[in-house]
Amino acid sequence: MSLPILSTTYAAENTVPASKSTYVVKNLNIGDLPVKTLVPITAKTREQALAQAKVIAENKDADIAEFRIDLLEFASDTKKVIALGQELNQILKDKPLLATIRTSNEGGKLKVTDQEYEKIYSEYLKKPFMQLLDIEMFRDQAAVAKLTKLAHQKKVLVVMSNHDFDKTPSEQEIVSRLLKQDQMGADILKIAVMPKSKQDVFTLMNATLKVSEQSTKPLLTMSMGRLGTISRIATANMGGSLSFGMIGEASAPGQIDVTALKQFLKTVQPTP
């Protein structure tokens, strides 16, 4: 998919933040050190999802669970998804739940129109089962704005996201997209890109550092695949606040076991 190129004026309009934004979700501080880990629920069935949630709930190295709704066999059945989401939230207890529909436009399994995307998320937000919601920044802009406002009204944090499984955009473009997410009202800024070279990995990491110097928002950035693993491990050194790990099955190329990830994060964590 060819994504729109954003202007670079967003970087110029931002100044070095005086302090970082932090959020307390189910007693978890998001936005400060140490880096918080996310683990995906990649199930196709209700039973598999419940089992995976129990494993995440019991794993001390997993801080947040991501519910990959698009991977479910019944992803289009809103009522079933909401019911399952409520069960997952109960099982996870003190661990936050991030609800995500990764659409086919950005490497996911569910193909939906902008109207359908807005309708589904609006239904979820009537009585939220999640504490965080992933909203793709390049969906219809009016829908993104409406969903972001609705999520905030319901006290749900917005993880605004962008994914490029084909390439790594320029450093300038990555910076521009992340700062655009900030201007669009995101609480957490996310981008995932695919490297073709070592330089691509450093492009993502340098962009993360630049955005961290211009935005107060927590950053969730990654260079995917084995080549980009270092970006997940050293994210704190670049100003990142969150990183994806896995227990069992990965939801994206390059994810590593969450226990190993946690140890790596502790080893390279910069001194405050």
UniProtKB/Swiss-Prot annotation:
Q: What are the positions of the active site?
A: 163 (proton donor/acceptor), 190 (schiff-base intermediate with substrate)
* Pathway assignment: Aromatic compound metabolism; 3,4-dihydroxybenzoate biosynthesis; 3,4-dihydroxybenzoate from 3-dehydroquinate: step 1/2
GO terms of molecular function: 3-dehydroquinate dehydratase activity
Catalytically driven reaction(s): 3-dehydroquinate = 3-dehydroshikimate + H2O
InterPro entries membership: 3-dehydroquinate_DH_AS, Aldolase_TIM, DHquinase_I, Type-I_3-dehydroquinase
- Top-level division of the source organism's lineage: Bacteria
Q: What induces this protein's gene, according to its Swiss-Prot or TrEMBL record?
A: By protocatechuate.
Q: Which UniProt keywords apply?
A: Lyase, Quinate metabolism, Schiff base
- EC supergroup of this enzyme: lyase
Tell me a GO biological process for this protein: 3,4-dihydroxybenzoate biosynthetic process
Pfam family membership, one:
DHquinase_I
EC numbers: 4.2.1.10
Binding positions for 3-dehydroquinate per the UniProt entry: 66-68, 102, 232, 251, 255
What is the role of this chain?
A: Involved in the biosynthesis of protocatechuate. Catalyzes the catabolic dehydration of 3-dehydroquinate (DHQ) to yield 3-dehydroshikimate.
NCBIfam families per the UniProt record, alphabetical: aroD
Q: Which family does it belong to?
A: Belongs to the type-I 3-dehydroquinase family.
Question: This protein is called what?
Answer: Catabolic 3-dehydroquinate dehydratase
Q: Which organism is it from?
A: Acinetobacter baylyi (strain ATCC 33305 / BD413 / ADP1)
